[in-house]
Amino acid sequence: MSRLEDYLSVYFITDSEFGRTHEELAEMALRAGVRAIQFREKKLSTKRMYEIGKRLRALTRDYDALFFVNDRIDVALAVDADGVHIGQDDMPAFAAREIFPGYIGVSAGNVEEAKKDERFADYLGVGPVFPTKTKEDAGEAIGIEGLRRIVESVSVPVVAIGSINKQNAIEVLKTGVAGIAVISAIAAADDPERAARELVELVRRFKSGL
């Protein structure tokens, strides 16, 4: 298993819509053992994104975790993020590869998209596996079988996303994904740190064959 895959087991995407700040949520997840944090924010100014990004970068370093910025390669470069995550409507993966030196994750919702971008990507974010309300432009759910087809068609690590929680995570992990990406399973929980710890332990036990 590569170093990157080790970090991707539970991948938390921060969301401030649930009453806590990006920084508060990230630190709770990091304390629980999450080792990949993505900062996704579509509504703030570039200046505010930079300020929050710098704080998240410092936090993730404290916990030896990887830090990704969604879409904004400029912010990722400015805060020295480990990686950037881009969608199908963002900068093309091949162009991002020319200007960004770190990890690049690319969203894919079908085999065609996955195969098109895998040679430029360090990992693929695949989904939504289940119907989701957290991302307005997420598209139709691909289901477990859709996820499995994509995992089997590419050679880079796949991180599954889309309404994944501790009730359905094992079913998702059985497809061979490197990890699961979550938002509301942690951010919307009454106790985000506990929710994150339960997910981390669940994935650890699955990967250990327990």
From Swiss-Prot:
UniProt pathway:
Cofactor biosynthesis; thiamine diphosphate biosynthesis; thiamine phosphate from 4-amino-2-methyl-5-diphosphomethylpyrimidine and 4-methyl-5-(2-phosphoethyl)-thiazole: step 1/1
Residues reported to bind 2-[(2R,5Z)-2-carboxy-4-methylthiazol-5(2H)-ylidene]ethyl phosphate: T132, K133, T134, I183, S184
Which Gene Ontology cellular component annotation is one that this UniProt entry carries? cytoplasm
Q: Which GO terms describe its biological process?
A: thiamine biosynthetic process; thiamine diphosphate biosynthetic process
EC number(s) of the enzyme? 2.5.1.3
Residues the record lists as binding Mg(2+): D71, D90
Question: Which keywords, in A-to-Z order, does the entry hold?
Answer: Magnesium, Metal-binding, Thiamine biosynthesis, Transferase
Task: State the CDD domains in the record.
Answer: TMP_TenI
For this protein, what reaction is catalysed? 2-[(2R,5Z)-2-carboxy-4-methylthiazol-5(2H)-ylidene]ethyl phosphate + 4-amino-2-methyl-5-(diphosphooxymethyl)pyrimidine + 2 H(+) = thiamine phosphate + CO2 + diphosphate; 2-(2-carboxy-4-methylthiazol-5-yl)ethyl phosphate + 4-amino-2-methyl-5-(diphosphooxymethyl)pyrimidine + 2 H(+) = thiamine phosphate + CO2 + diphosphate; 4-methyl-5-(2-phosphooxyethyl)-thiazole + 4-amino-2-methyl-5-(diphosphooxymethyl)pyrimidine + H(+) = thiamine phosphate + diphosphate
What cofactor is this protein dependent on? Answer: Mg(2+)
Cofactor: binding comment: Binds 1 Mg(2+) ion per subunit.
Please provide, alphabetically and separated by semicolons, the GO molecular function terms listed in this UniProt record. magnesium ion binding; thiamine-phosphate diphosphorylase activity
Q: What class of enzyme is it?
A: transferase
Can you tell me where the transmembrane regions are? none
PANTHER family linked:
THIAMINE BIOSYNTHETIC BIFUNCTIONAL ENZYME (PTHR20857:SF23), THIAMINE-PHOSPHATE PYROPHOSPHORYLASE (PTHR20857)
Known role: Condenses 4-methyl-5-(beta-hydroxyethyl)thiazole monophosphate (THZ-P) and 2-methyl-4-amino-5-hydroxymethyl pyrimidine pyrophosphate (HMP-PP) to form thiamine monophosphate (TMP).
Q: Which NCBIfam families does the annotation name?
A: thiE (TIGR00693)
UniProt name for this protein:
Thiamine-phosphate synthase
Q: What is the originating organism of this protein? A: Archaeoglobus fulgidus (strain ATCC 49558 / DSM 4304 / JCM 9628 / NBRC 100126 / VC-16)
Q: Which gene name does the record give?
A: thiE
